[in-house]
Amino acid sequence: MLKNITVTASRGVARKTPIAMSDVDRREVENKLGNNELPEMLNQTPGVYATKNSGAYGDSKLNMRGFQSSNVAVMVNGVPVNDMEHGGLYWSNWGGLGEMVRYMQTQRGLGASKVSVPSVGGTVNIVTKTTDSKRGGYATYGVGNDGFNHLTVSVSTGLTKSGWNFSMLFGKKWGDGYIQGTNFSDYDYFFAVSKRLGQHHQIALTGFGSPQSHYQRNQYDGLSVEGWQDVKRFMGGKSVYRYNPTYGFGKNGERKSSAFNFYHKPQFSLNHIWLIDDKSSLNTALYMSIGHGYGNSGQGINSAYANSWYGAANGKLRYDFRHADGTFAYDQVQELNEQSDAGSKMV
C-alpha cells in the first residue's frame, strides 16, 4: 500500500558519488536566504560565484568554474530551464523558488547535452517541495533595507481519510531596490495535490510560478571611474553605485526608469506512481512549462534623439534630459512629445 509520494531522481551523494558536487539543504536556505536572491545561496559553494549584476530584482548572474550561465546547466526538478536559444538564464522568472526549495545540488565539471546547454561549467539542480504528509501551516513576514517586504503563507491538509493531500504556499515580495528606480513586485505560488487510487496507484499534480515586474538600470548606462565620481554630488553621502542614470519623475510625480521587465513562467508536473509488487514500481511524469512577458525601454524615433534615452555614453553621464539634482527629466520628454506636430519624438 502506498503511504506517501516518493520523488525519485538521479542525485549524487556527498562523499560517495565520484564527482565534484555540493549540497545546500532546506535548513541552510531558511537560515541564510533572507532578502538575498536564490543564486547567492551558492556563493559559499566551491567553484561558484553569484552576484546581483545590475542590482535590480531578479537580475542575478551565476558563474561556475569561471563559465557564464550559458555554459552552466540549471534545472528545476530535473527540467532544464536555460534559454533554448542562447543558453542564458533569467533568475527573475524563478523569484519565488527560495520558499519552495527542498534542496539544491551543484555538480562541477563537464557535462553533455544534445539540446539547450552544454554544461562545460557544471550543473545546478533545484528540487522543490512535494505534498507535505503533515497537517499544519505557517505565516511569515520579513522586512529589510530599501523598503524590502516579504510575506509568505503556507498550509497543508496532510493525508486525509479519503486519500487526498493538499499543500499550498503563497507569497509576495516588494520593495524599492538598492539601485535608484528599481522598485519591484513579485507574487509567488506553489501547490501540490495528490490522491491515492486504490492500494497500488497514486497521482500528484504540482505547480509553481512567480509573476514579477521590476524596473532595471539599463545595461548600456555603465560609467567609468570618472563618471561615478561625477555623480557623487547627486547622492547625498550614499554610495555612488546606487545611482541610476535614467531614474527620474514624470510630470505627475510618478517614479520612472527607462528599463522595465515583466514575466511569468510557471511550471507544472503530473506524476503517477504504480506499485506493481513488493519489489517493483513504475513512476511516470509529465511536465509543462509555459511563459509570457515583455520588457521595454526608451527609444528615439529619429536620429536627433536616437541615443537620448541612454543615461550615459562612453562612460560619462549624458545631460540631454537631466535635472540639476541628477534625475532624468521625464517631464521634459513628455513636453517635447506634446509640442511635436509629427508625433512623439521619444517613446
What are these regions (language model features)?
Residues 12, 69, 81, 144-146, ...:
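Structural signature of outer-membrane beta-barrel domains
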Residues 33, 37, 59, 119-121, ...:
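Transmembrane beta-barrel architecture of outer-membrane proteins
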Residues 39-80, 102:
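Extracytoplasmic beta-strand/coil segments of soluble accessory domains associated
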Residues 42, 103-105, 124-126, 284:
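Non-catalytic regulatory/gating segments with a bias toward low-complexity or hydrophobic composition
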Residues 61, 80-108, 127-129:
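Short acidic/polar hinge/loop motifs at secondary-structure boundaries
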Residues 136, 143-174, 179-218, 267-277:
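Transmembrane beta-barrel wall of Gram-negative outer-membrane proteins
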Residues 194, 202-271, 296-346:
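Acidic/polar loop-and-plug regions of large Gram-negative outer-membrane beta-barrel proteins
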